[in-house]
Amino acid sequence: MRGLSRNSGAAAIFAILLILAVHNWSVAVSSQSTEFAGDFPPFETECRGTIAECSVSAALGDGGDLFYGGGEMGEEFEMDSEINRRILATRRYISYGALRRNTIPCSRRGASYYNCRRGAQANPYSRGCSAITRCRRS
C-alpha cells in the first residue's frame, strides 16, 4: 500500500509538470504568430521611439513611417502648439503668462512665475530653523 501511494504521488507530479510544459509550449507557439490577439500588438523589433510611436507602428505592421508619412493613426498623436496651450491652460500650476507665445513669463532671476516682482523669492523658506535643516540665519 505504501509503494502504491508513492507511485501515485510521483505520477501526479509528473502529470502536473507535463500539463505545464504543454501549456508553456502552446503559449510560446501562439505568441510567435504575427496576428494581433490581445490588448497589445506584438513587437517584432526593438523600437527606439516613444510608447505611442512604437505601439502605433507595431499595430500597422508594415514598418512605414506613420508620423511623417501621413498615416491614419499618426494624426492622433500629433498636437500643434495651440492645442498644447489649451491643455496646459486647464492645469492650476501654469500661469497664463507662461502660455503666451514667444514670451518669457518672468525675466527676473530667482523670481517665481506667479510672483514676478523685484525682490520676490521663487521658493521662500517657510520651515522653522534647526541644526538638522541647516537653515540660514539672518
Curated annotation (Swiss-Prot):
Propiece residues: 29-88
Gene Ontology cellular-component annotations: apoplast
Gene: RALF23
Pfam families: RALF (PF05498)
Modified how: Proteolytically cleaved, probably by SBT6.1 (S1P), a subtilisin-like serine protease (subtilase).
Matches recorded under InterPro entries: RALF
Keywords, alphabetical: Brassinosteroid signaling pathway, Disulfide bond, Hormone, Secreted, Signal
Disulfide bonds: C106-C116, C129-C135
Location(s) in or outside the cell: Secreted
Protein name: Rapid alkalinization factor 23
Recorded family membership: Belongs to the plant rapid alkalinization factor (RALF) family.
Signal sequence extent: 1-28
Native source species: Arabidopsis thaliana (Mouse-ear cress)
Keyword DNA-binding: no
Phosphoprotein among keywords: no
GO MF term list: hormone activity
UniProt GO BP: brassinosteroid mediated signaling pathway; calcium-mediated signaling; cell-cell signaling; negative regulation of growth; response to brassinosteroid
Signals that turn on the gene: Repressed by brassinolide (BL) treatment.
Physiological role: Cell signaling peptide that may regulate plant stress, growth, and development. Mediates a rapid alkalinization of extracellular space by mediating a transient increase in the cytoplasmic Ca(2+) concentration leading to a calcium-dependent signaling events through a cell surface receptor and a concomitant activation of some intracellular mitogen-activated protein kinases. Negatively regulates brassinolide (BL)-mediated signaling pathway (e.g. BL-induced hypocotyl elongation and branching limitation).
Site location (Required for proteolytic cleavage): R85, R86
